[in-house]
Amino acid sequence: MNSKVFAVLLLLALLTCILSEKYCPTPRNTSCKKMNIKNNCCRDSDCTSNAFCCAEPCGNFCHKASDKPGGRRVDPNASCQTGYVYW
């Protein structure tokens, strides 16, 4: 009996973790018409208030987490520098 209760509680805990996952919001623009981009962040730790560092067409920006997938978080291991990046 105890193992069944444990299994149910474990399943509920896993579902809660999966359903509470947060994402970067979908970017407003799909392309960038500028000749330069500006990275306001390169990793989540560059953002305040538990925001995510999200990749967008015109650079990386901090955004509040979204419940729906659609955006892309910046890879913290990728080569990145904050500020303007010229093509």
Swiss-Prot record:
Residues 21-66 form the WAP domain. One of its GO terms (cellular component) is extracellular region. It is found in: Secreted. Disulfide bonds join 24-54, 32-58, 41-53, 42-80, 47-62. Keywords: Antibiotic, Antimicrobial, Disulfide bond, Secreted, Signal, Toxin. One of its GO terms (biological process) is defense response to bacterium. Contains 5 disulfide bonds. Its main location: secreted. Residues 1-20 form the signal peptide. SUPFAM superfamilies: Elafin-like (SSF57256). One of its GO terms (molecular function) is toxin activity. Expressed by the venom gland. Belongs to the venom protein 11 family. 01 (wap-1) subfamily. Has antibacterial activity. This is U14-lycotoxin-Ls1c. It comes from Lycosa singoriensis.
